[in-house]
Swiss-Prot record:
Its main location: cytoplasm. This is 4-hydroxy-tetrahydrodipicolinate reductase. The gene is dapB. Catalyzes the conversion of 4-hydroxy-tetrahydrodipicolinate (HTPA) to tetrahydrodipicolinate. Homotetramer. It comes from Erwinia tasmaniensis (strain DSM 17950 / CFBP 7177 / CIP 109463 / NCPPB 4357 / Et1/99). GO terms for molecular function: 4-hydroxy-tetrahydrodipicolinate reductase; NAD binding; NADP binding; oxidoreductase activity, acting on CH or CH2 groups, NAD or NADP as acceptor. PROSITE patterns: DAPB.
Length: 273
């Protein structure tokens, strides 16, 4: 890479998040749109990406032919579905393109594929690209180190009716941050559903609760509750542009990085706090 401007390709460019990403690229210094990809056979192929996103003609048309634009971008941003992301991951690895992955819902095999690809290309893989959420991840880590041994820990998340995975990737990232702080295996300490006669709450568990309703962009709360007091650390997003700007920031940050797996806390230099 190391061009004057990073050329960014956006997958799912015709979707809600894709259009926000196009707008974020247009607004960003040090980046420009290189390609805008849509699903195979889309009726929008040939449409100007900027006009679709509401930011004026950019001279970049929507395409479903990844091979045709292979030389037009340095970094690919993908916020789609796991199966599609893994297809683009294989292409980027083969063609030595960096990647920003905001897709959630990967199984262990999908995560392993991302880790393997990072041996050859630079990848930022994060459940959430909001600056605020990544600050929250650091805060819940700190709270867990102080209160985790004795407090009841619950994570509550809410999203719009169209979200297809639960709990959200961000909720799971919060759980992982807490588990890592406690030297726990999240799989052994997580409780994802309660129904019927559950008995008393088990100590040293992390409960997850999920809401799907309306047009909620994203809300997350980590609760550390003891007898007589509780601490709640919350984040509420009101616009997808928050995530889009963070993803573009991550793409620009990747300039000059040849390989490795990073997260948004790397981009924001939060790991050392």
């Amino acid at each position: 890479m190391s061009n004057a401007e990073i050329r960014i390709a956006i997958v799912g460019a015709a979707g809600r998040m894709g259009r926000q990403l196009i707008q974020a690229v247009v607004l960003a210094e040090g980046a420009r749109l290189g390609a805008a990809l849509v699903r195979s056979g889309s009726s929008l192929v040939g449409t100007d990406a900027g006009e679709l996103a509401g930011c004026g003609a950019l001279g970049i048309t929507l395409t479903d032919d990844l091979e045709a634009v292979a030389n037009d971008f340095d970094v690919l941003i993908d916020f789609t579905r796991p199966e599609g992301t893994l297809h683009y991951l294989a292409f980027c690895r083969q063609h030595h393109k960096a990647m920003v992955i905001g897709t959630t819902g990967f199984d262990d095999a999908g995560k392993a594929a991302i880790e393997a690809a990072a041996q050859d290309i630079a990848i930022v893989f994060a459940a959430n690209f909001s600056v605020g959420v990544n600050v929250v991840l650091k805060l819940v880590e700190k709270a867990a180190k102080v209160m985790g041994e004795y407090a009841d820990i619950e994570i509550i998340e809410a999203h719009h009716r169209h979200k297809v995975d639960a709990p959200s990737g961000t909720a799971l990232a919060m759980g992982e941050a807490i588990a890592d702080a406690m030297s726990w295996d999240l799989k052994q300490h997580a409780v994802y559903a309660r129904e019927g006669f559950t008995g008393e709450r088990e100590a040293q568990t992390i409960g997850f609760a999920t809401v799907r309703a309306g047009d909620i962009v994203g809300e997350h709360t980590a609760m550390f509750a003891d007898i007589g007091e509780r601490v709640e650390i919350s984040h509420k997003a009101s616009s997808r542009m928050t995530f889009a700007k963070g993803a573009v920031r991550a793409a620009i940050w990747l300039d000059g990085r040849k390989k490795g797996l990073y997260d948004m806390r790397c981009v924001l230099n939060l790991h050392d706090l």
